[in-house]
């Protein structure tokens, strides 16, 4: 069986609506694509980096919960996982910081 491998950045998107945080979800373009493929039943792995912190653990758990292989993920003991702030407008379009 063939497997799709995604390579990219990992971030935790903190979602704001009316300037208040309402959700936090793992993201990054390649990560989102790989999770979508895995949810569609396609075997998938992801290669990226997270920090050795709570955010990194949350991202790894999210990938595992979505049946994405994480054996090649780099866990940086010195680095911190990346965060992104996404502010939604009235039509739920995001403006990222």
Question: Predicted regions span which residues?
Answer:
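Gly/Ser/Thr-rich beta-alpha loop segments that engage phosphate groups in nucleotides
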Residues: 10, 29-30, 50-53
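Short, glycine/charged-enriched secondary-structure capping and boundary segments
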Residues: 19-22, 60-62
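Conserved N-terminal subdomain of the carbohydrate kinase-like
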Residues: 43, 47-97
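Positively charged, low-complexity intrinsically disordered leader regions
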Residues: 1-21
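A general structural signal for well-ordered alpha-helical segments in protein cores
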Residues: 4, 30-34, 56, 82
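Short catalytic helix/loop segments, enriched in acidic residues and glycine
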Residues: 20-36
């Amino acid at each position: 069986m063939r497997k799709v491998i995604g390579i990219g950045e990992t971030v935790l998107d903190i979602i704001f609506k009316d300037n208040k945080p309402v959700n936090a979800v793992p993201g990054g373009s390649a990560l989102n694509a790989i999770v979508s493929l895995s949810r569609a039943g396609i075997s998938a792995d992801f290669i990226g980096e997270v920090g050795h912190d709570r955010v990194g653990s949350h991202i790894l758990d999210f990938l595992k919960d979505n049946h994405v292989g994480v054996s090649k993920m780099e866990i940086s003991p010195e680095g911190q996982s990346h965060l992104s702030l996404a502010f939604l407008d009235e039509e739920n379009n995001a403006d990222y910081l």
